[in-house]
Amino acid sequence: MSSRSSVAVILICGFTSLLLAQAPPAPPKPGPEHKKLEYFVGKWTVEDEIKPNGYVPAGKTVGTETDTLGPGGFYVESRAEGGQLPTRFGFMAYDSHAKVYTSYYASSVGLVGVGTGTVNGNTWTWMVEDKYAGKSVKGRTTITMLSPTQYTSKYEMADGKGGYTTIVEGKAAQSRSAR
């Protein structure tokens, strides 16, 4: 083997060793869109007024919603229970590839749903599709952040004519210590 060939082999082996010895890339960090979800983290007392509808009895109800930040800070897990509404478990995340917020949930009465969300100033708007008993229902949830510890919400169901009918309106509050 010539000295040129020997030098080439040594250089190739050296560069290969360097490439293999490099540390793996650092895991991604949550971006500003993910950080917006942190608003919801904490234990909330939710007071809702259910309007007359064909799904749940009308009336006032009080429940709790506990939201926790998932490992890595990329999503928020949510558990809502108490009152007349079914217990629900779900999560909200920001899909940085599709550039949209997403939500998924399931309830104690077999209702499952998926939605996409946008945030504009202090207002979150979620377009959801609920599935229950073989039917698909489109809806819209609007959340308006009033302060770091208070928000209002409204769930509306598509009426089939291009409009929406309000099903639930409410407000939520949390103590500062719950954050």
Functional labels for PLM-detected ranges:
Residues A8-L18:
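Bacterial N-terminal signal peptides
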Residues Q22-R179:
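Hydrophobic small-molecule pocket/channel-lining residues, especially in calycin-type beta-barrels
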